[in-house]
Amino acid sequence: MRVQVILECTETKLRHYTTTKNKKTHPERLEMMKYNPVLKKHTLYKETKK
């Protein structure tokens, strides 16, 4: 079952990325490096609750 998740920046708390994940195969929280347009660099984004 794929669900949509929101990613939040750990530095600026921006939430402007969404993605999907399979909860059955990846039950842990998602973390990935994404580009932050405010800081103009890549930062760590973590999965948040809606």
UniProtKB/Swiss-Prot annotation:
Keyword Ribosomal protein in annotation: yes
Gene Ontology BP terms: translation
Gene Ontology annotations for the cellular component aspect, listed alphabetically: cytoplasm; ribonucleoprotein complex; ribosome
Gene Ontology MF term list: structural constituent of ribosome
InterPro entries in alphabetical order: Ribosomal_bL33 (IPR001705), Ribosomal_bL33_sf (IPR038584), Ribosomal_zn-bd (IPR011332)
Gene3D superfamilies (UniProt xref): Ribosomal protein L33
Keywords of this entry: Ribonucleoprotein, Ribosomal protein
Domain of life: Bacteria
Membership in a protein family: Belongs to the bacterial ribosomal protein bL33 family.
HAMAP family: Ribosomal_bL33
Name this protein carries in UniProt: Large ribosomal subunit protein bL33
Phylogenetic placement of the source organism: Bacteria, Fusobacteriati, Fusobacteriota, Fusobacteriia, Fusobacteriales
Gene: rpmG
